[in-house]
Amino acid sequence: QSRGLGDVYKRQLRAKACETGEMTKLNEDLLPGCLLHRTKPNDVARVENRTFICAESADQAGPTNNWMDPAEAYKMLYDIARDSYKGRTMYIIPYSMGPVGSPFSKIGVELTDSIYVVLNMAIMTRIGKKVMDTLGDSNDWVRGLHCSCDIDPEKRYICQFPQDNTIISVNSAYGGNVLLGKKCFALRIASYQGWKESWQAEHMLILGLENPKGEVKYICAAFPSACGKTNLAMLIPPEGYRNKGYKIWCVGDDISWIRKGPDGRLYAINPENGFFGVAPGTNEKSNPNALAATRKNTIFTNVALNLDNNTVWWEGLDKNPPENAIDWQGRPWNGKTSEEKGCLLYTSPSPRDCS
């Protein structure tokens, strides 16, 4: 459910997204509140070679990041973005990474021309008037500009300006490149903020555990993308352990902001407010909690559409692919692969669900 986006406004945006074809409404009985979105075939994943840290010097960008001179980057990006909003609606998204008003939280504002971005950010972050009220007259917020432009991969850039608290993304409409609160802010910009303020932004899950004696422990764990963070974060204790009183709960499945407390211990929050999970391989056995979370108010991206019941399907969901379906590129698919043509990609290289 969207947090901070009024129900009436949310319904209007969802209806507009379906009217324009940007999204498809799914079966309200089987998947209430769920939508399907397809990106262009050339825009299906984060693009690390087009992602830049535009710090004052290359040394400040870090050894594993791409660097671009800030002045050069601003000129290039504004030349690409100029006039790209003509004839389009501009949406303004004030959002909080972390609970609104928490001393651990940070605020950002994203401008975008994509309803898909608005509806996803309403799931993944806390948005709305409370954020603006909390910000007040402070200048401590992250500026974000997203321009879909023409989805031209040759002019696609995702640039972070840590010294300016600024993010600019152009020529993409894929989640990881355009939901600027995620990797762009919560990891890249936040890493610089943490360096200045003595805390850490980490690509880590947070998991709570309680034993039968009532002792509670929390763990953080770092895996690369699509390597099991969400599955571990949403772990359910085996029946034998459940019967003995062991409990596990998910605090976060992707990003941790970690601080040292006054008692010398480490404290972490999940700055996000939803889940942006990898769909393939998610099923009743591998991650029943994640699957249950997708059963309502979820935005699916680049998965197959089952035309018989207007639901979605992806690789690994079950062993019964739909025989009357549309793949992630909008092409008819009969649930089979072709040895002559190779496997028909019914889901894209990085299909997602946002719940």
Cite the ranges covered by each PLM segment.
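Glycine-rich phosphate-binding P-loop
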Residues: K217-E239
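Long, low-complexity segments enriched in small/aliphatic residues
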Residues: N302-A304, D308-S348, R352
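N-terminal accessory targeting/assembly segments
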Residues: S2, G6-L135
